[in-house]
């Protein structure tokens, strides 16, 4: 069961990157490993309902149940203690990862207000890409009227690319909307 984006990768992206970087074997071509979604909900320390709504939103967006993240240390200025739930995260792999990226690239990112593309500088030096989304309502799975608060999330795309140039070429081949 190949998704649309996975089929596109095998038929179009692999030959294009082999030609661009001079790979001799298709297994050398960088590929997507996982997409990690993280939502930090600082207000969850005082109100548990906020965290429940964040978990529900993320499960709708990702298609699987997220893990509740807990604080590691007590911070008096943030009014949190060690072990209190303060967010949620989920890791998408294989088919769910490709489905999520397909929706992100073709539906969600164009729905962002004043969208001019994502920054091409958000690579970590080892071929992974990180980006933030300011509001979860850009995803089609979220009903705008049922949202209690606008929350953002972090999206980390992990690849097998050795360099940032390879990773950027991989994501650009997937028609990822880079600004520059």
Curated annotation (Swiss-Prot):
A single GO cellular-component term on record: cytosolic large ribosomal subunit
InterPro entries: Ribosomal_uL5, Ribosomal_uL5_bac-type, Ribosomal_uL5_C, Ribosomal_uL5_CS, Ribosomal_uL5_dom_sf, Ribosomal_uL5_N
Record-linked Pfam families: Ribosomal_L5 (PF00281), Ribosomal_L5_C (PF00673)
Keywords on record: Ribonucleoprotein, Ribosomal protein, RNA-binding, rRNA-binding, tRNA-binding
Family: Belongs to the universal ribosomal protein uL5 family.
NCBIfam families in the record: PRK00010.1 (NF000585)
PANTHER family noted in UniProt: 60S RIBOSOMAL PROTEIN L11-RELATED
Name the UniProt record assigns to this protein: Large ribosomal subunit protein uL5
Gene: rplE
